[in-house]
C-alpha cells in the first residue's frame, strides 16, 4: 500500500489494503499527499451543542457533545464545511468517492459546499 502521508504519521489501524487515522481531520488532510485517497467517509460536526436539552429515557439530558460540535452562525459553519470539503477534494483520487453523514442542521450547507468547491 502506498504511503498517504507526508512525514511519519502512525495509522490508528491498518491492514495491507486500508488505513484508519485518528486525529483532527484538518491537520491530517494537510499532511496527506494530493490525489492519494480512494474513498472518504466523513461524519462532520452537526453543530448541535448549543446548551439545549432533550428527553432520553424519561430524563432531561444535555445535547452538548463537546467543543468540536459547537456551532457559530451560518456563515462560520458554512466556511468550515467549505474548508474541509476543499481539503478532501485535494486528496481524493480522480474517480474517488466521498460519503458524508449529516442531519438537517448541517447537510444543506454541506451540499452547497460540495457544489462550490
Where are the model-predicted features located?
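S-adenosyl-L-methionine-dependent nucleic acid methyltransferase catalytic domains
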Residues: 1-117
Amino acid at each position: 500500500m502506498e504511503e498517504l502521508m507526508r512525514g511519519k504519521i502512525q495509522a490508528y489501524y491498518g491492514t495491507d489494503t486500508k488505513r484508519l487515522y485518528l486525529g483532527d481531520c484538518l491537520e491530517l488532510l494537510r499532511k496527506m499527499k494530493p490525489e492519494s485517497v480512494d474513498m472518504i467517509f466523513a461524519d462532520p460536526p452537526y453543530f448541535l451543542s448549543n446548551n439545549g436539552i432533550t428527553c432520553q429515557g424519561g430524563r432531561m439530558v444535555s445535547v452538548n457533545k463537546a467543543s468540536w460540535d459547537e456551532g457559530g452562525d451560518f456563515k462560520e459553519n458554512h466556511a468550515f464545511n467549505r474548508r474541509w470539503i476543499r481539503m478532501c477534494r485535494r486528496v481524493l483520487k480522480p474517480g474517488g468517492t466521498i460519503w458524508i453523514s449529516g442531519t438537517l442542521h448541517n447537510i444543506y450547507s454541506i451540499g452547497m459546499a460540495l457544489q462550490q468547491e
